[in-house]
Every structure is written in structure tokens, then in C-alpha cells.
Amino acid sequence: MIYDVIVIGAGPAGGMTARILSKKGYSVLIIDKKKKVGCPIQCGEVISEFGLMNSKLKPRKEWIKRKHKGIKIFVPDDNFFFSFTKSYSINREKFDQWLIKEAVDYGGRLLLKTNASGIRKKKIWYVKTNRGVFKSDILVGADGPEANVAVWLNLLRKKEFVGAIQYKFKSIDFPEKEFLCMFLNAKFKNGYAWIFPRGDEFNVGVGGIGNIKKWLDDFCKSKGFDLNKKISVNAGIIPKNYILKNFVKQSALIVGDAAGLTNPIFKGGIYAALFSGKLAGETICKAFEFNDFSLLKEYADKLRNSPFCNPILKKASEIFYSFKNEELNFTGYVYSQNNWKKVSYFEIFLKFLSKPKFFLKLRDLWTVKNGIELSEKTI
């Protein structure tokens, strides 16, 4: 059998792509090397309300854990400021499974424990796996940070990532229940620590480049959390700087983490996965409708023009994560216990006047402010 589309990867990006295509009646094969969709969990399990709404998905009780008012961002001296980006903590395992079930219910086929080991293109795509060779007209690489499909297509020029590790606690004594909490410190190179309240449980984690396991253990101890009471551990990698020659080659498309679309400031990737998966699915439908696969390049064009590929994000991230603790504390002083959006440029300027040694960082803080604003539409 020759499928219309083979999707490699059953995460949010692959699930969304497959859901759209199978709903339109196209034959879709989804393959994933995992034994179970959504396992193991490799993220903080958060998506913004905007991201979910813009993906045309309604919150469902089966995978929503808690709604949050926003993000409370702590600097090393314990000062903090807010980003009032409403968001949801989700059960990522159930969310991924729901998306894939939707695709299968519409007619898609799912094969788990199926590891793609290579691809070949003649008139159609041949995907080599441990369960045989599968064929399709169009191929979608939704294989996460490993990005094997992009590598096989010779599209991936650069691949840098950060590590992340997270403990789940059934219940911890932590006063903040309404906000996601993000803890900045220069020792978390290219990352941060987090505490995400989820109703009857909490996710506590650290991401960055370095000894993240030690950082997380030390962080938990500093907050008084009993490590013996953690109920699960998950870890993974998060794209930091993936540079692709293109997001499309011939009749193959790269989506989600495999395309390096993760937000470089907050490290969130679920909305980026859904956005790119939705865009890929819609573009593929159009290509089939007009019997013109050259239209697939529209996916790359639209993705490049989306907020996810805006160079401000990368620039702001590089500046943000180059700050020393003194500069992070000054950032906390500038926005002190306020919604960062409501602090005017004049107020920021006055803060700089009060501490003139930071004047050389004025432009940097402006860039970070712009990056955070853009991030609120990409997480």
C-alpha cells in the first residue's frame, strides 16, 4: 500500500498533522518508536491559553490539570515580576494520546514500537523500519529533538540543545498555587528552574547546560522539598539552536521540535508543535487538492513569517541567558512585583537613572522586553 502521508513521530506535532489529514479523508500512517503514545513525558506540560485557542482546540477535562493566571519570574535575590500569560498545565501523556486517537478515529493508522532507520525517495517515499518498508507520497518528520528525518534529508545545519530534568511530587508545601513559577540564576546556564502547581501535584524541574541533576536536587533542597517523596522523574533534551536549510525538501516537511521551533526564552514547545503541525496538515491538504506538490513550499514560507521564527526571540534569549546574577537582580528591580507589560519605558528609564552603572544594559533590556512580549504568543 502507498499511503498519502507517513508521519514519523506521534507527539503533538505529528498528532496534529495526522488529525487534520485523516479528518479530510487522506490515508495516513503514523509511526513511533515508543511503546506507548506520550510516554515518557519529556517536558513541563504547559501550554498557553492563546496557544490552545489558536490551535482550534478546546480544553478537555481528560487532559487539563489546572489553569494558571500567568508566570511569576523570580530573580536570584528573590524579587520577582509577572507575565500575565494565561496558561494550562496539562497531562501530556493523555493530551498526546487524545490527539492521536482523534487521528485514528478519523481513519489514520498508528504503529508503535516502529523505529524508522532511514528514508529513500524515488517517485514516492520509502521509509525503512524494524517492521518493514512503508511507502507514501508525502513524508512528515515529527520525530522530536532527535530530528533524524531532517538529518537524513541533509536539512539540519546546526543542532544545539539543553538538557532538562523534572521531578513530580504528589503534594508539596509551596505557597504559590495560581502561577507558574520560573527561577532565574546564572548558574543555570541557558536555562532556569521551575515549579509548576498542577492541583494535586507539582512539577519541579531544571533545564540548562551542565549538571542538571545536581542543580535540581540542590534546588529542591533549597525549597525544602523532600526528594524521597518524588513520585516520578522525567528527563529529555530541548532544542536550543537548530538551524535548518529549509523546512521542506521535495515532498517532505519538518515540524515541531524537529524543526527547532521551541521558544528559546521559556523553552516551551507544545504550541509550536501544534502550530506547525496544523500548518503542515493544511498545506498538504492543499497540495493534494490541486495535485501540485510544489505548493508544499508554502508551509516553509508561512512558518518563516510566523512569530516562531522571528529573530528577536533568538537574540533576546542570547542576551537574557548571558546575564549575570547582578544583572538578573537589576531586571527584577526594574519590573519589581509588577506585570512587566505595565512598566512604562519612562519608568524603566528612571530605574536606570537610579543605578547608572547598568546604563550599558539599557538596549539589552529593551531587547529582552521585546522577546518576552513575542514569547507570550509562542508558548
Feature annotation, model-predicted:
Residues 82-102, 208-215:
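Short beta-strand to alpha-helix junction loop
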Residues 285-379:
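C-terminal helical "tail/cap" subdomain of flavin- and related membrane-associated enzymes
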Residues 37-72:
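N-terminal FAD cofactor-binding segment of flavoenzymes
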Residues 1-11:
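Beta1/beta-strand and adjacent pyrophosphate-binding region of the FAD-binding site
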Residues 14-15:
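N-terminal Rossmann-fold NAD(P) dinucleotide-binding loop
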Residues 102-229, 260:
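Predominantly flavin-linked oxidoreductase catalytic cores and closely associated redox partners
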Residues 116-118, 133, 210-284, 298:
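FAD/FMN-dependent oxidoreductases across multiple families
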